[in-house]
UniProtKB/Swiss-Prot annotation:
Residues 351-368 have a biased composition (Polar residues). The keyword Repressor applies. It comes from Mus musculus (Mouse). This is Carbohydrate-responsive element-binding protein. Residues 15-41, 53-77, 332-397, 449-468, 489-533, 547-570, 583-602 are annotated as: Disordered. The gene is Mlxipl.
Length: 864
């Protein structure tokens, strides 16, 4: 099939496409054919940053035909005028965006009939203007940009047409996005089928060894964008049925919406970023730069709650059948099952006490991968520096854990020789017991000052070492509870002791390989090395170990025999072993029953019976481990029982609970903080009038804070204005009170003595006169309000006893009440009463009715 298609493509003669005369392209001879790049005629174009690209934007002849009204004639193919200055396009830009722009992202100019080429040119001009303004720091002559937080200028771009055209009010749904995406996916298939129907096979040639060039790929994707979207007259009537998604997308693996699913985060993308990844939106954005607090919490949780992988790690040696797999329930329940004695040990000797109480532990390793034997810390701090006390070599097989001469401890007195002779065990028991001793490497730790002497319960025949030099010591499975006090950050290997390791090699014949051994130092005594620098694996164990694996150190009875030929070494040996374990007094366990005596060679190996301690019933996670203590007995029978410090390391579960509580507290505090922030922003939305007026509009937090600050500033200005106005009113009140007091001081001390009956009669006569005149003209009632204070003062001051008194009191009344300084406050009070008792200020048309009602209802002189 491929050969036939290739022959078809070779045999078909495709004429060269020449630009038509009606092409108003602003570039030189751009060929829209997708076979342009194959012929080598395509010129490389310089693409700057932010260049919106479509391969053939000038091949939209179908769009021009659709825009033209009426049939297409020969006269329509004449030359057209080209506008190289972009004047018409900038007019369209000014029409769509009358204010300033906010972002240089792609704009479709909805509502304007623009060609695809013109939209690209406009968007390139907009992007270039943004580049000139913000990168080159120059003023762009085309258009300007503003940020939402630039004060009064921020409202310039908030015009309705700009907001709608920018897409802030688009109802974007995932179905719309998927539909647009599917349109882009079916362009190539539709063009391929159309070309195959016309007999022109336009399938792109397969480029061997990688993708085709970018220009060719873009041409293949975008060469027929506009015809496919709009569908012209050249398309077949049934061609739209080929756009069936089931038909076109059946063999296309749609991975866009599975790869771009947003991660569960509190920072949701704004609506403007819903089209990230669309073919139109090829501009870079700032979405990857938005921080996520949840990611930071996950990273912090990784450091606080990190657990090493529980995958089984390969060891440096093959375990023997005696080390069977032990279930994890041994650690979870806290109960250690004692090992049953082997048949060889149970039936070998008559009357000897077999080493049947040993507890086998299969410690889990926290270090991923096999442990490198080289960086392990040497156990030479337990070896004396005196080379004379070292064990001389002897031929024969070697046990896994022969102990050197014990170190000196504070308060250790020389012990008396043991009254019990040594015993020789059967040979079949020694390898298993040695292996069991090697599995627990803590027996050589220096004991506490409290030391008690015990007779040796069990003694074995020593197995000499095969050669001079190293003393084997297994540190393969080291519980993490012992690592922290020994290998601290400030721990330094004592001078004269350098850790050296010999990697073990597997023994031939299918036998198990020996674990890595530690040799005694033979180098210069001035060499000093820190445990952290020489121990990368132990450092990893310290940093990444589980808290649950921190086990309690065992409390073990042991028997260490010392050579009688050097009694002075008992007190003069190195006391620096106290630096590794603090001198905590430990209780002395009960004496084991001594077994029957059996003669043995003078230099023998003593393996005491290890006691198993049951865990306390209150905590199932605390585990007490017991181990074996092997030591070399020189030619002498000094028996000393040493007990290591009993430090109960039960911090595993406590630290775990504390860490979990801290994590929960941190999460709850973070949730509370976020809820308070959200509640605060919701409160601001309700308080600020500009935000509460449009509750459906989604506003960013920065805009919310800016609007809130502006609203607070406005409230402060209004409050200052109100306070200033209130102060002015207070000043006016004080001035009025002062004027009133001044007027009152000018009144006479005693008024004219008149009868009360005469005063009431004059008032009734005045009311009757006012009523009569008001019914004829309502304005007289307003005049009566102004003249009533003068009438009251005249009625109270003028005396009619005689003409002389009438003249005198009338002149006095005129001077006192009718002068201009006296009339002003009186008229002012009358006008105030008129304004408060009637609606002359709010609705003057109601004043005649109110005046008539006042004189008819007898409310003259009183507020309505």
């Amino acid at each position: 099939m491929a050969r036939a298609l290739a022959d078809l493509s070779v045999n078909l003669q495709v004429p060269r496409v020449v630009p038509s005369p009606d092409s108003d392209s602003d570039t030189d001879l751009e060929d829209p054919s997708p076979r342009r790049s194959a012929g080598g005629l395509h010129r490389s174009q310089v693409i700057h940053s932010g260049h919106f690209m479509v391969s053939s934007p000038h091949s939209d002849s179908l769009t021009r035909r659709r825009d033209q009204e009426g049939p297409v004639g020969l006269a329509d193919f004449g030359p057209r005028s080209i506008d190289p200055t972009l004047t018409h396009l900038f007019e369209c830009l000014s029409l769509a965006y009358s204010g300033k722009l906010v972002s240089p992202k792609w704009k479709n100019f909805k509502g304007l009939k623009l060609l695809c080429r013109d939209k690209i040119r406009l968007n390139n001009a907009i992007w270039r203007a943004w580049y000139i303004q913000y990168v080159q720091r120059r003023k762009s002559p085309v258009c300007g940009f503003v940020t939402p937080l630039q004060g009064s200028e921020a409202d310039e771009h908030r015009k309705p047409e700009a907001v709608i055209l920018e897409g802030n009010y688009w109802k974007r749904r995932i179905e719309v996005v998927m539909r647009e995406y599917h349109k882009w996916r079916i362009y190539y298939k539709k063009r391929l089928r159309k070309s195959s129907r016309e007999g022109d096979f336009l399938a792109p040639k397969q480029v061997e060894g990688g993708w085709p060039p970018p220009e060719r790929w873009c041409e293949q994707l975008f060469s027929s964008v506009v015809p496919v979207l709009l569908g012209g007259s050249e398309e077949e009537p049934g061609g739209r049925q080929l756009l069936d998604l089931d038909c076109f997308l059946s063999d296309i693996s749609d991975t866009l919406f599975t790869m771009t699913q947003p991660s569960p985060s509190s920072l949701q993308l704004p609506p403007e970023d819903a089209y990230v990844g669309n073919a139109d939106m090829i501009q870079p954005d700032l979405t990857p730069l938005q921080p996520s607090l949840d990611d930071f919490m996950e990273i912090s949780d990784f450091f606080t709650n990190y657990r090493p992988p529980q995958t089984p790690t390969s060891s440096n040696y093959i375990e023997s059948p005696s080390f069977g797999p032990m279930a994890d329930s041994l650690f979870s329940s806290g109960i250690l099952a004692p090992e049953m004695p082997s048949p060889a040990s149970s039936s070998s000797s008559s009357g000897m006490t077999p080493h049947s109480g040993n507890t086998r532990l299969q410690a889990r390793n926290s270090c991923s991968g096999p442990l490198d034997p080289n960086p392990f810390l040497s156990s030479e701090f337990l070896l004396p520096e005196d080379p004379k006390t070292k064990i001389p070599p002897a031929p024969g097989p070697t046990p896994l854990l022969p102990f050197p001469t014990p170190v000196k401890v504070h308060g250790l007195e020389p012990c008396t020789p043991s009254p019990f002779p040594t015993m020789a065990p059967p040979p079949s028991l020694l390898p298993e017991e040695s292996l069991l001793s090697a599995r627990f490497p803590f027996t050589s730790a220096p004991p506490a000052p409290g030391v008690s002497t015990l007779p040796a319960p069990t003694t074995f025949v020593p197995t000499p070492q095969p050669g001079p030099g190293p003393v084997p010591f297994s540190v393969d499975h080291l519980p993490h509870g012992y690592l922290e006090p020994v290998f601290g950050p400030h721990f330094t290997v004592p001078q004269g002791m350098q850790p050296r390791c010999k990697p073990s090699s597997p023994s031939p014949g299918g036998q198990k390989a020996s674990p890595p051994t530690l040799a005694s130092a033979t180098a210069s005594p001035t060499a000093t090395a820190t445990a952290r620098d020489n121990n990368p694996c132990l450092t990893q164990l310290l940093r990444a170990a589980k808290p649950e694996q921190a086990l309690e150190p065992p409390t073990m009875p042991g028997t260490l025999l010392r050579p009688p030929e050097s009694p002075q070494d008992t007190v003069s040996e190195i006391p620096r072993a106290r630096a590794f374990f603090p001198p905590i007094p430990a209780p002395t366990p009960p004496r084991p029953p001594p077994g029957p005596a059996t003669l043995a060679p003078p230099r023998s190996l003593v393996v005491p019976k290890a006691e198993r301690l049951s865990p306390p019933a209150s905590s199932g996670s605390e585990r007490r481990l017991s181990g074996d203590l092997n030591s070399i007995q020189p030619s002498g029978a000094l028996s000393v029982h040493l007990s290591p410090p009993q430090t109960v390391l039960s911090r595993g579960r406590v630290d775990n609970n504390k860490m979990e509580n801290r994590r929960i507290t941190h999460i709850s505090a973070e949730q509370k903080r976020r809820f308070n922030i959200k509640l605060g922003f919701d409160t601001l939305h309700g308080l600020v009038s500009t935000l509460s007026a449009q509750p459906s509009l989604k506003v960013s937090k920065a805009t919310t804070l800016q609007k809130t600050a502006e609203y607070i500033l406005m409230l402060q200005q209004e409050r200052a204005a109100m306070q200033e106005e209130a102060q002015q009113l207070r000043d006016e009140i004080e001035e009025l009170n002062a004027a009133i007091n001044l007027c009152q001081q000018q009144l006479p001390a005693t008024g004219v003595p008149i009868t009360h009956q005469r005063f009431d009669q004059m008032r009734d006569m005045f009311d009757d006169y006012v009523r009569t005149r008001t019914l004829h003209n309502w304005k007289f009632w307003v005049f009566s309000i102004l003249i009533r204070p003068l009438f009251e003062s005249f009625n109270g001051m003028v005396s009619t006893a005689s003409l002389h008194s009438l003249r005198q009191t009338s002149l006095a009344w005129l001077e006192q009440y009718c002068s201009l300084p006296a009339l002003r406050p009186t008229v002012l009070n009358s006008l105030r009463q008129l304004s408060t008792s009637t609606s002359i200020l709010t609705d003057p048309s109601l004043v005649p009715e109110q005046a008539t009602r006042a004189v008819t209802e007898g409310t003259l002189g009183r507020p309505l």
